[in-house]
Amino acid sequence: MTTGFLQKIFGSRNQRLVKQYQKTVETINALETQIEQLTDDQLRGKTDEFRQRVAAGESLDKLLPEAFAVCREASRRVLKMRHFDVQLIGGMVLHYGKIAEMRTGEGKTLVATLPVYLNALAGRGVHVVTVNDYLAQRDAEWMARLYNFLGLSVGINLSGMEHEQKQQAYASDITYGTNNEFGFDYLRDNMVYETEARVQRALNFAVVDEVDSILIDEARTPLIISGQAEDHTELYVRMNALPPLLERQIGEEKADGTGVEKPGDYTLDEKSRQVFLTESGHEKAERLLAEWGLIGEGESLYAPQNITLMHHVYAALRAHTLFYKDQHYVVQNGEVVIVDEFTGRLMAGRRWSDGLHQAVEAKEHVKIQSENQTLASITFQNYFRMYAKLAGMTGTADTEAYEFNEIYGLETVVIPTNRPPKRIDKQDQIYKTAKERYDAVIRDIRECYERGQPVLVGTTSIENSELLSHLLKQAGLPHEVLNAKQHEREAAIVAEAGRPKRITIATNMAGRGTDIVLGGNAEKQAAFIEADEAIPADEKARRIKQLHDEWETLHEQVKAAGGLHIIGTERHESRRIDNQLRGRAGRQGDPGSSRFYLSLDDPLLRIFAGDRVRSIMDRLKMPEGEAIEAGIVTRSIESAQRKVEARNFDIRKQLLEYDDVSNDQRKVIYQQRNELLEAHDITETISAMRHGVITEVVRQFVPEGSIEEQWDVPELEEALRNDWQLDLAIQEMVNESSSITADEILDAVTTAADEQYEAKVAMVGRESFSAFERSVMLQTVDRLWREHLAALDHLRQGIHLRGYAQKNPKQEYKREAFELFAAMLDAIKQEVTRIVMNVQIQSPEQLEEAAEQIEERSGHLENVEYQHADYAESGAPVANVAAATAATATADMVGSAMTHGHGGELPKVGRNDPCPCGSGKKYKQCHGKLS
């Protein structure tokens, strides 16, 4: 109550910010007359003037009014588009590293030009991030005219580009690309063996378009570069026979033994999408597997030798009970293709992990492809948090404002519309069954069609869009279906979705990024006429005028019919996705309307609100075909959506907390990897490693401060001879001296190791040997880091079980992850020292050959896949990765390498700073020991 009272007096935080930015808008507008009088050359010359002022120490904030005024004037001259005042406010929000929520049709692409131009003046690069290649290319080509006019270079970063093209794109002042491509380039840069092979610069400033889609919807899905693993095809086929023989248990057993309606072998948790074997299920599975010869008679599934089988049992169960054809995946050309649950898009090239994809392939009786091992991976949460400054734009961010602030430290500012919105959002209509719902949808579409009103129908899945298309065909209503398979065709259809009588069915976010203009898109057709060289100039002008006149008539006709009508056939579990669908209507003050049609069979209603609404319908004795349309029901649904959103936020936050553990370790490893790449001479590092390893070996047999009776000299001699190529007569030294100490033995062994090392260096020369050492070190760090991440992954999969032992799983994970990391650092030192001390070299040529073999072995990318939503594997630049990066590994290099690493991009850890691993020690006394 107090908050509401204070808001009335002082306004909300959002209103105060907008008011504050409005003052700067007035300053920019005051400069307009002065800037308008400049010639094109003088306007272009402003860019050089600004650059010099920035180089002299002037801040970008101080430069903002002038830079925005120049950019607006250039846009007016080049693009024939002048930024509105609210667009200037949007530009300021982005420049100050916040999220701008702008309604559909308010010109987000144009808004981005203001902060992008201003920040590009610093010369450190600006990334404009979009959701697909089509939008990246469209926006880059469209806005490049403006940036080039102002003297700035523009690059496009697309999948499938050559290595040199990528380097050129990143060297530009402004780089357009997709979130996936920026992330994958980052990972590939972390797998290089030469600094020249990198493509990215330091991560400076990113403007993310459709920021909610990238930073929230896709936050739970990491980018993964993977290679082929061991083949378990036969096992998946045999396990596929198990789920049909098991029965589902209905009801959960309570403490008093009640609650089970029907006993069975497994239980399903639809909310968390998990399946669990019951006690009887375990016994039945063990009996069946023993009959099939997969485990020994009377053996438990949890016996050490059978633990891997459990993984296959659960993968098969999940494939049969939680993943459905035409809802979660489709079978296309003999392959299982995932359907994105948020967008309804087919995601060719993306595969489920943990053997689930292979289990689904076995279920559908298609060819089972080999399991993959992760070679490199990063989440968008950790990638985008590495930019020095991050900003985003979307039509719907306010519902997720808390998460943006909590996870990314980004404030959301709602930008006022240029014209007041006129869209009418009608109340939801809820029917008992899906059939009644679809009948009502068809009736509504027919009414719109008859009065010439365009309709956009949003569905949550491909299956539903095809069902609706079938019903519309039966009703004799012509329509277009968008299943989000081809972005360019998608954009063309969506652009024409505002024509009279046009019916368009689209999965939730198909065609996002393209405006629906009432009356159709005359500009595109005019561009085709303009580009046709066969048409004379006067004829072109006549045709374009005729086109615009026709559009004007159609535009008014559609406005009179009520504008674009949006129909939602189901509520999404996120209010934001529903708002995105609604937001397609009523752009820039146009009329429009929206309505959602629901049924009690919808997953959201069934799981969260079904019983309550059904009891209301039963009490009201609703006849068949009659709908409930009441505020209380709509509020009940929104309450259910809020519950789901809160649960999803908790999941994402928890994932991030776990991922932060490996992320902190990454910072250490990749900082050291970069220092290795950039160091001219790593002799000191190798020497420190050698001394550390030799000390450990000697102390194992001759403990510090011990007496002769406690020593095991023969074993020490054998260990040094077999493992370290050091043939020393230590027993003779002990026999000859009555007062020799443990420290003197250590000194003798260390001196011998140093002499052996120096002899090898003298044989081939310091430069050649350093190159060999660097290759050994990089290959060893990469391989053991991947194995470490695989170990972390296995640790994480079972860590929740510690909760049953009254232990905090997160704390346990941090503790054990730290122990694993310390063990990995020791293993790196041991491995590198062993290779360097054991290598037998006669000439520099031999050494060069050995270094090449190491790099070739680690640089051989076999059957590499790039996995993430919307990232087609066929477009991934596999060949040029192998050529350009000479990195990564074959299948014998297990595990994964997460995150980035260019010297300037990860925060430097000072020697006396606290170690990022969380041990509480200084970095130099903890993980800094490696370097």
Swiss-Prot record:
Keyword Ubl conjugation: no
Reactions the enzyme catalyzes: ATP + H2O + cellular proteinSide 1 = ADP + phosphate + cellular proteinSide 2
Localisation per UniProt entry: Cell inner membrane; Cytoplasm
InterPro entries: Helicase_ATP-bd (IPR014001), Helicase_C-like (IPR001650), P-loop_NTPase (IPR027417), SEC_C_motif (IPR004027), SecA (IPR000185), SecA_CS (IPR020937), SecA_DEAD (IPR011115), SecA_motor_DEAD (IPR014018)
Residues that coordinate or bind ATP: 87, 105-109, 515
Main location (coarse class): membrane
Lipid bilayer topology: Peripheral membrane protein
Gene3D superfamilies in alphabetical order: Helical scaffold and wing domains of SecA, P-loop containing nucleotide triphosphate hydrolases, SecA, preprotein cross-linking domain
PROSITE patterns: SECA (PS01312), SECA_MOTOR_DEAD (PS51196)
Sites where the protein binds Zn(2+): 915, 917, 926-927
E.C. code: 7.4.2.8
Biological processes annotated in GO: intracellular protein transmembrane transport; protein import; protein targeting; protein transport by the Sec complex
Disulfide bond as UniProt keyword: no
Pfam families, sorted: P-loop_SecA, SEC-C, SecA_DEAD, SecA_PP_bind, SecA_SW
GO cellular component terms attached to this protein's record: cell envelope Sec protein transport complex; cytosol; plasma membrane
UniProtKB keywords: ATP-binding, Cell inner membrane, Cell membrane, Cytoplasm, Membrane, Metal-binding, Nucleotide-binding, Protein transport, Translocase, Translocation, Transport, Zinc
Cofactor names: Zn(2+)
Similarity remark: Belongs to the SecA family.
Subunit composition and interactions: Monomer and homodimer. Part of the essential Sec protein translocation apparatus which comprises SecA, SecYEG and auxiliary proteins SecDF-YajC and YidC.
Protein role: Part of the Sec protein translocase complex. Interacts with the SecYEG preprotein conducting channel. Has a central role in coupling the hydrolysis of ATP to the transfer of proteins into and across the cell membrane, serving both as a receptor for the preprotein-SecB complex and as an ATP-driven molecular motor driving the stepwise translocation of polypeptide chains across the membrane.
Name of the protein in its database record: Protein translocase subunit SecA
Protein source organism: Burkholderia ambifaria (strain MC40-6)
